[in-house]
Amino acid sequence: MEGVLAANWSAEAVNSSAAPPEAEGNRTAGPPQRNEALARVEVAVLCLILFLALSGNACVLLALRTTRHKHSRLFFFMKHLSIADLVVAVFQVLPQLLWDITFRFYGPDLLCRLVKYLQVVGMFASTYLLLLMSLDRCLAICQPLRALRRPADRLAVLATWLGCLVASAPQVHIFSLREVADGVFDCWAVFIQPWGPKAYITWITLAVYIVPVIVLAACYGLISFKIWQNLRLKTAAEAAEAIAGTEGAAAGSRGRAALARVSSVKLISKAKIRTVKMTFIIVLAFIVCWTPFFFVQMWSVWDADAPKEASAFIIAMLLASLNSCCNPWIYMLFTGHLFHELVQRFLCCSSSHLKTSRPGETSVSKKSNSSTFVLSQHSSSQKSCS
């Protein structure tokens, strides 16, 4: 049957492959082979992505757990986005890595369906939690006086997770363990030909990529407009203050009012603009990482002559997983104090452990501790451990 994608990249979360060959001639010809050199490159890339995604997002969750600002609205969404990235690492990247090593799926039919289901759950969750965080930043800028409503935030996150679980359900029906050659079984997708693969991949592309990108663009368009309004108000207020200073006491009250408006605009900008920059960079990383993936997916189902076995075509499929290991570095860039506090707490607790485990070397340990924290001797993390 048409649409069988070689080199085992059909094991990706959204597989555009059709049912295995059913013609007797295909059965007797033996199972399809793969490019072993390319497979080794895939394994190396996936190992690196898995390590970075697991270690980076685990550090983010640990830092968020130990920070003093646990109830921050932004940190709440960062936590769930990191959990979604861990789901991608464990249930999408890791199975794909094992699959590239073994070439064939070795497991029962239930495991085949479960793996394919969880792969798409992570994809949906990572996308829509990022969308939810961006909507929250948009509301924070456009409605700065909006009260913090933690139950509403939790309900929105819960609804997002449940929606992702439901939206991924078709994977359970599409994928199954099937015989691809005489005595050779693999986890394959079965579509109604010829429109099945086109309909499903197009729907996934719309739901996970195109619609979220449109909404994200609208969010940051509104944010940019609001920031421009604030800057214009700030400029007008500064001009009014300058005029008031030259017109004497009669205009003094107007000058003070203008100064108050200037301070208000400054406060909004300083409090929000950094988090907006962070989420904007995360969105850019999402677009850069996922665009090649969905481009080759759509190309493979809408063009019968697409080079499905080309190296560049296959490597482009792997770039999507990079998004899960990029996010922790973006968090570190914009919220570096989180990781600074985490490192301080770790070093402080390690030093405290050394002092208690070596009572005969108290003076040496105390000297080491003072030199280690000479740059941050007043930090709260040090006080909590001492």
UniProtKB/Swiss-Prot annotation:
Q: Which GO terms describe its cellular component?
A: plasma membrane
Which chain regions cross the lipid bilayer? 39-63, 75-97, 114-135, 155-175, 203-225, 278-296, 312-334
Region entry Disordered: which residue ranges?
1-31, 355-386
Name its cellular compartments.
Answer: Cell membrane
Q: Please name one Pfam family that this protein belongs to.
A: 7tm_1
Sorted keywords for this record are: Cell membrane, Disulfide bond, G-protein coupled receptor, Glycoprotein, Membrane, Phosphoprotein, Receptor, Transducer, Transmembrane, Transmembrane helix
| Gene3D superfamilies reported for this sequence | Rhodopsin 7-helix transmembrane proteins
Residue ranges, Cytoplasmic side: 64-74, 136-154, 226-277, 335-386
From the Swiss-Prot or TrEMBL record, give the protein name.
Oxytocin receptor
Species name: Sus scrofa
The opening ranks of the lineage are: Eukaryota, Metazoa, Chordata, Craniata, Vertebrata
